[in-house]
A protein has these predicted regions:
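N-terminal interaction/assembly modules
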Residues: 1-159
């Protein structure tokens, strides 16, 4: 499910940043569980907490995740899913269609658009860097992710 998670090692990123990264990686997994198992987000959160959270904590050498961020972005993506998906579809190049994206790639884009255009707590450059790194962890095409997120970050989008 996750390949290069060790890149977020404690020697590279401080604990406070790894907690946020862990929350974002966890959000990708929770949204994946919700999509694949066709369950609501609360059920997916519970399944994740019981079965997968300890793996993320161990891999990132953390005691806990940034839970407020995790809940805010997962619930936010669920709430804004349709307008976010519309913006993703609208802004993909002609040779890319939304159904060409893997579930994780799509959810990473959803999370990044939610954080850039709704949540607005972190600056867009930080969000782009974080989600491009997460794209890499989930075997995504980082050139695509970087190009798409950079392009869309320059637009005035209201969700």
């Amino acid at each position: 499910m996750i390949k290069n998670i060790k890149k977020f090692d404690k020697n590279i990123r401080p604990n406070s940043i790894r907690k946020k990264t862990g929350a974002r990686i966890s959000a990708v997994q929770i949204l994946y569980l919700s999509d694949i198992c066709a369950v609501d987000i609360k059920t997916a959160l519970n399944v994740f907490s019981e079965n997968y959270e300890s793996v993320i904590l161990s891999e990132l050498n953390l005691k806990k995740l940034e839970i407020d961020l995790l809940h805010r972005i997962t619930n936010g993506v669920i709430k804004y899913r349709k307008p976010i998906d519309f913006q993703i579809s609208k802004n993909l190049s002609d040779n890319w269609k939304i159904n060409r994206l893997s579930i994780n790639e799509l959810n990473i884009l959803r999370l990044s658009l939610y954080e850039m255009f709704v949540d607005k707590i972190f600056d867009k450059k930080t969000i782009i860097n974080e989600y491009v790194s997460i794209f890499d962890v989930f075997s995504g095409n980082i050139d695509f992710a970087n190009g798409f997120l950079d392009m869309i970050s320059k637009k005035k989008i209201i969700l």
